Amino acid sequence: MDEKYDAALDLLRRLNPNNLTENLQRIIGLEPELAEDLLSSIDVPLKVQQDSKQSGRPFLCCDYNRDVDSYRSPWSNEYFPELSAEDLQESPFPSESLRSLEVLANDSFDVYRDLYYEGGISSVYLWDLDEEGEFAGVVLFKKEGSNKESWDSIHVIEATKGNDDETFTYRLTSTIILALDNKQNDTSLAGNLTRQTEKEAKIDTSNTDISHITNLGTLIEDIESQLRTQLEIVYFEKTRDIFHQTRSQKSTTDSQEQQQKEVIKGLQNL
């Protein structure tokens, strides 16, 4: 089982990242027993669904807000498409207190999205952990452009109590999925970048919700800035260097071929 899982991951790393979703489904079709492990460990571009109970307001879909083939909206707290009454009884929902924090988080990160992304869609989903007051969740951002260009940010969070009631440890696993496509010269660039970080922070016990939003907002803002910088300075620059080197080698090869043709032509004229 482990060998098949490792082989699947290795194969996905070598295939075109633009076709990640399709390739993942094909592998699961071949080895269904790998489905749960692969879906929980492989981040794919986020889907968009509409909340018909909130005037068709869009929300983002991932494995964390999915139940059966439906997705829970952060706006109405209902599943779309609608689940049967039997399935709905078993469907996961946040507790009442955590739902209050989830609503505040969605409103807050919607403002963040508007300021930093100048468009796009954001969604936040939270779920309870075993210890009272602790929770986990995911913060999602998606911005699409023309020609299938897209930026997906997936931040999986875990908030657990520290040594005292006023301290929380926030663990964050962030993934950026980027796709760029230039139709004019048939050039595309796609891939993903994942980083983990952890931070301890104080909370105001008289207003824990605001404290959690402030701490998570600061943490996500910092990691997104770092990832953007890393993509721009490290990965884009390295890709450009490889591209220029390839073009330079091709020019050198073309020049050598021309010189060889001239030598052969000269010998033929002797």
UniProtKB/Swiss-Prot annotation:
This is F-actin-capping protein subunit beta. Component of the F-actin capping complex, composed of a heterodimer of an alpha and a beta subunit. Residues 245-258 have a biased composition (Polar residues). The gene is CAP2. GO terms for molecular function: actin filament binding. F-actin-capping proteins bind in a Ca(2+)-independent manner to the fast growing ends of actin filaments (barbed end) thereby blocking the exchange of subunits at these ends. Unlike other capping proteins (such as gelsolin and severin), these proteins do not sever actin filaments. PROSITE patterns: F_ACTIN_CAPPING_BETA (PS00231). It is found in: Cytoplasm, Cytoskeleton, Actin patch; Cytoplasm, Cytoskeleton. Belongs to the F-actin-capping protein beta subunit family. It comes from Candida glabrata (strain ATCC 2001 / BCRC 20586 / JCM 3761 / NBRC 0622 / NRRL Y-65 / CBS 138). Keywords: Actin capping, Actin-binding, Cytoplasm, Cytoskeleton. GO terms for biological process: actin cortical patch organization; barbed-end actin filament capping; mating projection actin fusion focus assembly; mitotic actomyosin contractile ring assembly; mitotic actomyosin contractile ring contraction. InterPro entries: CapZ_alpha/beta, CapZ_alpha/beta_2, CAPZB, CAPZB_N, F-actin_capping_bsu_CS. It holds the Pfam family F_actin_cap_B. GO terms for cellular component: actin body; actin cortical patch; F-actin capping protein complex; mating projection tip; medial cortex; nucleus. Residues 245-270 are annotated as: Disordered.
